[in-house]
Amino acid sequence: SETCYPVKLIYGHIQQLIDQKVDYIFLPSIHTMKHEKSRVKHNYGCVYMQTAAVSIAKALDIESKGITLLSPVFDLDFGQEAMASAMLGLSRILGIPKPFCAKALLSGAMAVRRHTAAVEKQGKALLATLKPEDKILVLITRNYGVSDPILNMGIPELLLERGYKVITLSHLPGHALDIADEYENLYYPFGQHILSGAKLIAHHPNLYAVYLTNHGCGPDTMLSHLFKQEMGDKPYLQIDVDEHFSNVGVITRIEAFLNSLNHRPVEVLPKDFVLEQVDIRPCHLPAVPEKDFPLWLPPLGEYTASLTGYFRAQGVDAHALPHLSAHALSLGRAETSAKEYLPFPALLGGILAQQEVDPAPAQFLIPQTRGAEADGQYARVIRAVLDR
């Protein structure tokens, strides 16, 4: 089936290694992740980050080619002990003494921390030297998109060639921001970092975002709506990366964006400006319906009638939304980018159609999960769309 663009590239990378007749392929499966400011029970990568290693190895049948897959399961949300346990298990397979493996693991972790601190320090130093007329472009994407020239389509070099300073999301203190009150159920750490970065960029008049999303990425389809809300009236360039991109088309979009920035008025920073002092707009999505407003339930198959009856027994004026119509779907698609999975514009369109019929205050039931697929973000994103 169709996968996101980064997973397609993993297929290619592994095939290259097969052609080189390697003995081992190291590709971890990342189950949970870590974000210091997150308040969700667990943080997750996408489903592909959890399953790509094993599924691709099976699809390419690497075992029959004499290649061993080394794919420890990383539960970064469970702390250092879980990480150590996953990595130390490789020492037996590779015939490496555990103390040697533990030392390498510790050295690697320390190197990552030093690098993270150094990059943020570098970004802070750059921002301190800016003149009012300076315009800095911030590349917004996940870490692997920053370093892979195929995933970023050479855009950093194209921007540098045109005389602009370019930094990455890692140069900004996004990890220090606590946005949990605004995004209670955002279980993607990279999503938390991207939206924190959006707040910082929107707040600083000299910073402008170049936001790279990946074709076929479920989380990106949701984050794009929230990113747009964060940027408000500030212009930014968003490019969806896939294998069909045209270099000429990318250059045309870049030059149009840069030309628009040249016409932006110069804004002088206040002397007491603090980058991290951004607006946090709490957004609480209640789990229990109120009795003062009608409650509309989306189509849930045979459960719709049961849930409607249950809520009515609790004193809530509950109703089932009509079955999806072509008009409702068109309303949903008008508010989306055509990259979202079909259930999202269908659900959104049903709500918008009902609001057309009766614009009075109402409640809509949108069940949500706590990881790791995109549907767990539907409620928050629909709230953002309704707030436009």
Task: Give the residues covered by each predicted segment.
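An N-terminal assembly and electron-transfer interface module characteristic of large anaerobic redox
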Residues: 1-388
